[in-house]
Design a protein with these regions (language model features):
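Acidic, divalent-metal-coordinating active-site segment for phosphoryl/phosphodiester hydrolysis
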Residues: 51-58
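Residues at or immediately preceding the N-termini of alpha-helices
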Residues: 41, 56, 73-77
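C-terminal long alpha-helix characteristic of the crotonase
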Residues: 9-14, 65-115
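CoA-thioester-processing core
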Residues: 1-49, 62, 79, 83
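Residues at helix-coil transition
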Residues: 40, 49-50, 89, 103
Length: 119
């Protein structure tokens, strides 16, 4: 789910993973494609094929998490509210256009998502 988010803040104790392989299935909802796009093929293959969990620090170093914040969930929520407020104070049209421009770089992702659905 993380690769679908625009901005990701995490606590230092957060863990992430693609555990579906442990259940005999592949990540759904485009998970294989989104993770590969976000962190690269080799690293995505390792995580998807082993089902290994990874830390917030690893996720941050790979660019999957925007920032590791504070010491706990409460601090992450406070920082998320600050980020949201900063964005809300910008021009709505400019924010929407910027999001669309960034998202346009992922248009080919849909092809991979179709492959996930077919599996």
């Amino acid at each position: 789910m993380v690769p679908r988010c625009d901005i990701i803040l995490a606590s230092p104790t957060a863990t992430f993973g693609q555990p579906e392989i442990n259940l005999g299935v592949i990540p759904g909802a485009g998970g294989t494609q989104r993770l590969t796009h976000a962190i690269g093929k080799s690293r995505a293959m390792e995580l998807i094929l082993t089902g290994r969990n990874f830390s917030a620090k690893e996720a941050e170093s790979w660019g999957l998490v925007s920032r590791v914040v504070g010491e706990g969930e409460g601090e992450v929520v406070k920082e998320a509210v600050k980020v949201a407020a900063a964005i809300a104070n910008k021009g709505r049209i400019a924010v929407q256009a910027a999001k669309e421009a960034v998202d346009a770089g992922e248009l080919c992702l849909g092809c991979g998502h179709d492959m996930d659905v077919a599996c």
